[in-house]
Amino acid sequence: MKNLQTFVIALPLLIVSSMASAVSVSGNIALTSDYIWRGMTQSAGGPAVAGGFDLSTDSGFYIGTWGSSVQFSDGTAVETTELELDVYLGYSTDIADNISLDVGYITYTYPGATDANFDEAYIGFDIYGFGISYAAGIDGAADYVSVGYGIDAGPGSFSIAYGDYENTSNDFLIGYDWGVGGDFGIGVYYYDLEMEDGAGDSGVTLTISYAP
């Protein structure tokens, strides 16, 4: 944990020093029938609009921001906001054939409800389509561990994932994504959530995305 935090603290300096290599900029926007995050709705079961921008270097360093409309009704501080805005930076690279590493730091912010803000340091591996990731919550925030698998299937790709949110919940996700009309994509996902207190939720979401 300390080694992971030490590395991500040094990431800004590493990114600046790597700017001499080629830099690319990308963006994305999406409309979803329900914004599901770790099995939990972030839009009160309704639609949400999201989008973001990323800057990456040939050497593997990246920095980006992502935002989404949100809607909460649980009586907590986040109920007072209708926006989530995340900022992240990291490093991604292939460490062997069909094996890749991604490590970074992300800040989740909710303008107007700063008590809900939290940070995570994360690390993930993709090994022949199997993924495993660990997000360490900072300053008392809960940790999250997930495993999954993705494979090309027909005109798109199939994915399945399971996650454990420390002292909070377990979630399961299965989905299919495919490209339509060049830069447009469609995704259909089934999610299932089990809270630590025994409550739960499940459903199907539809997402339309554009990433030029």
Regions from the PLM with identified roles:
Residues 2-10, 16-212:
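Outer-membrane beta-barrel proteins
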